[in-house]
């Protein structure tokens, strides 16, 4: 049997990152939605979401995908949106010397040619640790870890952002700033 919390977390990711229209709601331009509105819409679509469960998912998610507003009235996804026009109000940050990206071998030829592209998302997601990048890459198969020369990119004028859950975000990573982890 599937864990109901995992199922609800995936449902929230769908609604808050990609398809709010599946339950007839819209997000504001910063990705927020009133918690009461979300709960009512989820309930109307057969989902048993309560205020307590939502807060538990926000607080206990190992990936910290979601955030509650300071006033406790709204919720949003921290990053990963494919919805156009969402502005997470991120400010540029100075990245560490290196960051990491987990992927699979099948896409390496394209990455070597084009670099890392954001595809349908707003940003390319990078990790501060190899372990996190391995977990991300392993979702699609045997992971290949790419090392990103983040500080060199920053010094070349490329802006980096850091989401509320510590994921580093950038518009793209040109191939000259990438190398494969040989370990």
Segments predicted by a language model, with ranges:
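Eukaryotic, polar/proline-rich low-complexity intrinsically disordered regions
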Residues: 1-183
């Amino acid at each position: 049997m599937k864990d109901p919390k995992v199922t609800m977390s995936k449902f929230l990711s769908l609604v808050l990152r990609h398809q709010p229209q599946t339950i007839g709601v819209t997000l504001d331009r910063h990705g927020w939605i009133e918690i009461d509105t979300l709960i009512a819409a989820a309930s109307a679509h057969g989902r048993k979401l309560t205020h307590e469960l939502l807060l538990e998912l926000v607080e206990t998610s190992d990936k910290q995908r979601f955030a509650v507003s300071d006033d406790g009235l709204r919720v949003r996804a921290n990053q990963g949106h494919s919805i156009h026009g969402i502005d997470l109000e991120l400010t540029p940050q100075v990245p560490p010397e290196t960051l990491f990206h987990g992927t699979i071998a099948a896409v390496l030829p394209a990455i070597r040619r084009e670099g890392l592209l954001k595809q349908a998302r707003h940003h390319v997601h990078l990790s501060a640790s190899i372990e996190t990048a391995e977990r991300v890459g392993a979702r699609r198969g045997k992971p290949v870890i790419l090392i990103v020369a983040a500080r060199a990119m920053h010094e070349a004028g490329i802006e980096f952002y850091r989401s509320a859950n510590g994921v580093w975000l950038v518009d793209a990573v040109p191939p000259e700033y990438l190398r494969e982890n040989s370990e």
